């Protein structure tokens, strides 16, 4: 069972962090974030979990290693819970986007979320 709240000090979060919300300007090296409609105060694991959940096939090593250069990375269990909560928030996306296989995709996603909820610390082991 997922906890109702993530532990941790609330910080300003994007609320829907994912690779498509980040723009990179090659000429200057600047990074821009977009789409702030879900900005809120929440533990840092919220945005990390959201970003990791956006591409579950990617282990997220580069993101977490870069993050660790500037801030302590939340515990693996916290990240796993954040990933599961983010995937749960996006659960209806296939239906909303009229995907013909929405029923199957939601079923697969629910199974993945249940697996993460049983062992959240295994979801983001990166060290």
Regions found by a protein language model. Give the residues of each.
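Short basic/glycine-enriched coil/helix segment immediately N-terminal to the Walker B
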Residues: 5-6, 24-28
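Active-site activation/catalytic loop segments of kinase-like enzymes and analogous catalytic loops
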Residues: 45-72, 84-102, 112
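Regulatory N- and C-terminal appendages and interdomain linkers associated
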Residues: 31, 74-75, 94-127
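An alpha-helical support segment within catalytic cores of ATP-dependent transferases
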Residues: 1-14, 113, 117-125
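Active-site Asp-x-Gly
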Residues: 11-12, 26-62
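Hydrophobic HxD+1 residue recognition
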Residues: 17
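Hydrophobic residue at the +6 position relative to the catalytic HRD Asp in the kinase catalytic loop
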Residues: 20-22
């Amino acid at each position: 069972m997922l906890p109702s709240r993530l532990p941790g000090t609330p910080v300003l979060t994007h609320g829907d962090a994912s690779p498509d919300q980040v723009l990179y300007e090659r000429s200057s090296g600047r990074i821009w974030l977009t789409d702030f409609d879900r900005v809120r105060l929440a533990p840092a694991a919220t945005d990390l979990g959201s970003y990791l959940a956006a591409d579950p096939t990617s282990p997220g090593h580069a993101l977490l290693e870069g993050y660790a250069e500037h801030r302590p990375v939340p515990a693996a269990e916290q990240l796993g819970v954040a990933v599961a909560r983010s995937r749960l928030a996006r659960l209806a996306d296939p239906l909303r986007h009229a995907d013909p296989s929405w029923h199957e995709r939601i079923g697969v996603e629910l199974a993945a979320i249940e697996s993460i909820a049983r062992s959240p610390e295994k979801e983001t082991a990166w060290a």
